[in-house]
């Protein structure tokens, strides 16, 4: 019988695995670059959900949390988060593809999370 952590990682609500599957199909089927960039971004977010779920389990197992709050900004976890972002294939694809799209220009202006990952200062912040 799988343990709590394994059951947590099998929960589609937590990992968004099914959504990732559909966004990956959408990337392949996209009829224009903006739709392709949007699909890549959503696939990247889905993969990040999975990666963060795995990180939360690791944090819980190592006891590096207090009162239910995870210290993801701590010196212990910053390198881990950076390495997760570096291994997210959709973030890498989006970094190379999106800057030429209208979607990218809108998201840089409207979404602070997107700007953190793909804006002018993203290289120094995450990679």
Model-inferred region functions:
Residues 1-127:
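Acidic, polar-rich low-complexity tracts and alpha-helical solenoid repeat scaffolds
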């Amino acid at each position: 019988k799988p343990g709590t952590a394994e059951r947590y990682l099998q929960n589609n609500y937590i990992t968004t695995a099914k959504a990732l599957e559909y966004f990956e199909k959408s990337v392949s089927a996209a009829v224009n670059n903006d739709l392709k960039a949007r699909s890549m971004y959503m696939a990247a977010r889905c993969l990040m959900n999975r990666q963060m779920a795995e990180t939360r389990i690791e944090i819980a197992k190592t006891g590096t949390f207090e009162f239910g709050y995870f210290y993801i900004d701590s010196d212990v976890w910053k390198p881990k988060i950076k390495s997760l972002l570096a291994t997210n294939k959709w973030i890498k694809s989006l970094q190379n593809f999106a800057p030429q799209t209208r979607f990218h220009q809108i998201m840089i202006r409207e979404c602070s999370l997107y700007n953190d990952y793909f804006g002018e200062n993203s290289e120094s912040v995450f990679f």
